[in-house]
């Protein structure tokens, strides 16, 4: 009887601990717009990680090289506390570097890309669009 109570409590704790992790990883998937709403990126599973591909760009951004179908985030893997780390690509400048994506709410994430050994970084606030 005591063993059954212990196992039940352990199961409840494990479910409580794993539920937020599952919810946050699923929440990363979707369509996200930059602050100017000039680019929309679709984030989805890519094997054992996440990636982000441009699904729409304004005419101005397309002229500058930001074209739909371009992968701008890759190999994003959980790093804890709603943070994902991977790679970023900036198509306007043709630069790749490290990426950190931090979910600050169900519909808001901060995307930071750094290049040249972390010397040059750019951070943007993206919002989920339905």
Language-model segments: which ranges?
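Edge beta-strand at a domain terminus
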Residues: 116-130
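Central antiparallel beta-sheet cores of small beta-barrel/beta-sandwich binding domains
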Residues: 28-99
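Sec/Tat signal peptide C-region and signal peptidase I cleavage site
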Residues: 19-25
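Predominantly extracellular/luminal cell-surface or secreted proteins
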Residues: 55-57, 114, 129
């Amino acid at each position: 009887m005591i063993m059954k109570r212990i196992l039940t409590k352990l199961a409840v704790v494990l479910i409580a601990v794993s539920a937020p992790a599952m919810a946050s990883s699923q929440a990363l998937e979707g369509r996200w717009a930059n602050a100017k709403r000039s680019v929309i990126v679709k984030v989805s599973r890519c094997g054992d990680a996440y990636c982000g591909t441009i699904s729409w760009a304004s005419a101005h951004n397309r002229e500058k090289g930001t074209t739909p179908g371009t992968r701008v985030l890759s190999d994003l893997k959980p790093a804890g506390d709603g943070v994902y780390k991977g790679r970023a690509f900036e198509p306007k400048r043709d630069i790749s570097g490290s990426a950190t994506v931090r979910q600050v709410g169900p519909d808001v994430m901060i995307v930071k890309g750094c290049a040249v050994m972390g010397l040059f970084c750019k951070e943007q606030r993206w919002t989920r669009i339905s």
